[in-house]
Amino acid sequence: YLTCNLR
């Protein structure tokens, strides 16, 4: 989430 805002 925090590093990869894909969801």
UniProtKB/Swiss-Prot annotation:
Tissue/organ expression: Nacreous layer of shell.
Domain of life (superkingdom): Eukaryota
Protein name: Uncharacterized protein IMPP3
Species of origin: Nautilus macromphalus
Lineage summary: Eukaryota, Metazoa, Spiralia, Lophotrochozoa, Mollusca
